[in-house]
Amino acid sequence: MRPATELAVRIGRELLKVSGSSRAARIWSPLIEQSLHGLGFRHSISPSLVARVIDPFLLNHHSLALGFFNWAAQQPGYSHDSISYHSIFKSLSLSRQFSAMDALFKQVKSNKILLDSSVYRSLIDTLVLGRKAQSAFWVLEEAFSTGQEIHPDVCNRLLAGLTSDGCYDYAQKLFVKMRHKGVSLNTLGFGVYIGWFCRSSETNQLLRLVDEVKKANLNINGSIIALLILHSLCKCSREMDAFYILEELRNIDCKPDFMAYRVIAEAFVVTGNLYERQVVLKKKRKLGVAPRSSDYRAFILDLISAKRLTEAKEVAEVIVSGKFPMDNDILDALIGSVSAVDPDSAVEFLVYMVSTGKLPAIRTLSKLSKNLCRHDKSDHLIKAYELLSSKGYFSELQSYSLMISFLCKAGRVRESYTALQEMKKEGLAPDVSLYNALIEACCKAEMIRPAKKLWDEMFVEGCKMNLTTYNVLIRKLSEEGEAEESLRLFDKMLERGIEPDETIYMSLIEGLCKETKIEAAMEVFRKCMERDHKTVTRRVLSEFVLNLCSNGHSGEASQLLREREHLEHTGAHVVLLKCVADAKEVEIGIRHMQWIKEVSPSLVHTISSDLLASFCSSSDPDSILPFIRAIENT
């Protein structure tokens, strides 16, 4: 390994190690800066080294990446260049940190740093996909002003994005600039743009523009452009204009296909212009060309890839409504992507797919189900599952698991249970995750008895419960005042060798304290101390103290904390003192602090400082001043 690469690896690993647990968000801190100084590499820092550290080590930790980037800029004699900016923009792009990207780009402009064209391309694409097309426009302007060549596909995606996002003034400026600079237009960019432009333009102006663009850009698909224009005109009640330009479009190499003719014919049905409809249908038979499915396939995939989902949906609706052929993978892509913005249309695409004798891929159904749940469309979810069930779609473990888990997420408990029973009739054994999902759905719906019944069913079926099973049930039973039942489950899980987690201890203790079963709560806490990590015990202890005080047992909480092993847990002492202050139980607090002073005087200052800090953030700090003074007097 080369020395520069070795150093980048050392720095990257050190940053990840010092910044904390991989589960938590990694935040830049003075401790990290101190650690970097200890590595002693400041004399050899360079933009390429910064880039090697950020990519790959910090790509998924934007805060850490930005902290390291800014720290490097402060080192004597160092300045960033295109390479280091590329790496930080890449990290920020992955986590969609658009504000930070905008601030950095302003820095680039003010410092007159010349970025590589690949950095501009990446920035523009990221911003367009993040629906920040206006910001992307200014990035492109900067790239053009520095003489950079930006690939036409990037410019076309931006043109489509500006138009689709409603930034029409910017779209028009970009369109003019692309033509002026000789940047070629393609079907995606020009198609989305002309679909908007034709809504308010005169037909002569429209045809003249299309003719000029088509002659200069032979790669543009004329039939697709014709469909987009005619569809847009009909949408804004200009079906007569659409009718009159049919022949003109043919003359400028934009031959309307059968779908284009059908769009106008259907618009005339709506307006009652039946004579004109007949004329259009005759023209269709005489002059229309069959739509090339491969062309529309490529166009729809381009729209989906560019996240122009509304436009993709509208083109697909024209195809579906006319029962024109569409490949299965295109329907899969449409159902999965369009469901994010228009779940109703996505379900209609599914209905169309099934009517043609095709069925969706499991990943497509998963995306559709997820988005239906996100949009709170449980009725649509049921409709989709019933349709697929009638075609024998649910026949193996994976598809049944998907259906049941999403029915549970949608809160459709009865339908979930019915599906579970059907699954068992098919000879398929539900696994513990399915039972857990259904039990949790029952608990959320306040259906405790069915949840218990499912527990019994798991036992009969020989399905082994896991931590999640116990967690869900113990938490709910504790909430519902069934502490004895939750304790029974707790004992069973210990017998079966399943280690409780922090949530289980806290749920049990909270439920037992509410029911004034203090000794039982103490016993649960002792088991926590025997079995668990000190950090967990400390958090559970603080929660235990809070629950004791909340239920009128401040004296017992103070007594609990007087056990030697809890003395150093200062956070729990602060919880107690804050609770007794709020409850105006000053004497308990004073006696507790006197005891601490007797057994460990050094802790008094720490606890007092923490207590005062917690009161400073209180909504009514004045109310506890007498308590603080009384504590100080101890």
Curated annotation (Swiss-Prot):
Protein name stated in the entry: Pentatricopeptide repeat-containing protein At5g14080
TM stretches of this protein: none
Keyword Repeat: yes
Signal sequence, renumbered to the chain: none
Gene Ontology CC: one annotated term: chloroplast
Domain of life: Eukaryota
Record carries keyword Repeat: yes
Keywords: Repeat
Organism: Arabidopsis thaliana
Ranges in coiled-coil conformation: none
